């Protein structure tokens, strides 16, 4: 989203990373008819957000001889797991591997993810901090990112205690799904939130340009 926002002229730059790997995946039923991405030809795929998810889907399917014209896209309005479990669609793009897989398992269905970064899509940081460079206080942001680093270290070193603290902030968090998702999210946290991988951001920006979602590529100094 940052690349799209920059292309639209929004005054934003990346200042840190919270989740350093993709969470998004293409989700199918483990025991369903889709064993490879080529099996999706002629099938229905659910999505929630037009644009980026279509580009991701196209990038994953095209190496397997499947074009977007070969599938039927259905907007399932963020009802990802129910759409696939009910048979409304054969797969969904935009499923978070730390949530939807657990949600399906709890409800008695096994899901399987095709991971974007293993299917030709450049890896990217899933969750980042952004700020307006004209208004940000550099010293305050440095302290904030340092606090994020210390918090992440504590979370990784103390997963049970950190879950108790996190779930204690809201009663609606205190359920099996969120506890499972918390555990699966732990290895995804950025241990060095201030670190910036220029190549990763440039690679994904090029992917977006080649997909037609942006027309020009920003200088790296305009990204972070």
Language-model segments: what does each one mean?
Residues 3, 58, 102, 149, ...:
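Predominant activation on well-ordered alpha-helical scaffold segments within soluble catalytic domains
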Residues 63-68, 108-109, 172, 213:
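Short helix-capping segments at alpha-helix termini
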Residues 1-77, 81-86, 90-98, 113-115, ...:
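Short, glycine-/small- and polar/acidic-enriched structural segments
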């Amino acid at each position: 989203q940052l690349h799209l926002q920059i292309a639209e002229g929004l005054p934003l730059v990346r200042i840190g990373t919270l989740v350093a790997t993709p969470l998004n995946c293409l989700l199918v039923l483990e025991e369903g008819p889709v064993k490879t991405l080529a099996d999706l030809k002629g099938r229905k795929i659910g999505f929630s957000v037009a644009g980026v998810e279509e580009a991701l889907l196209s990038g994953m399917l095209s190496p397997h001889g499947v074009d977007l014209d070969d599938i039927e896209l259905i907007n399932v309005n963020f009802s990802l797991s129910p759409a696939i479990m009910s048979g409304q669609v054969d797969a969904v793009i935009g499923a978070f591997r730390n949530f939807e897989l657990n949600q399906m398992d709890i409800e008695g269905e096994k899901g399987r993810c095709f991971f974007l970064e293993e299917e030709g899509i450049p890896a990217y940081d899933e969750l980042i901090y952004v700020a307006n460079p004209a208004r940000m206080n550099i010293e305050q942001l440095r302290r904030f990112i340092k606090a994020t680093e210390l918090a992440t270290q504590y979370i990784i070193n103390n997963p049970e205690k950190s879950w108790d603290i996190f779930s204690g902030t809201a009663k609606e968090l205190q359920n099996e799904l969120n506890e499972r998702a918390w555990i699966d999210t732990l290895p995804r946290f950025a241990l060095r939130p201030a670190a910036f991988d220029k190549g990763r951001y440039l690679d994904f920006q090029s992917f977006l340009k080649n997909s037609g979602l942006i027309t020009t590529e920003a200088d790296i100094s305009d990204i972070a």
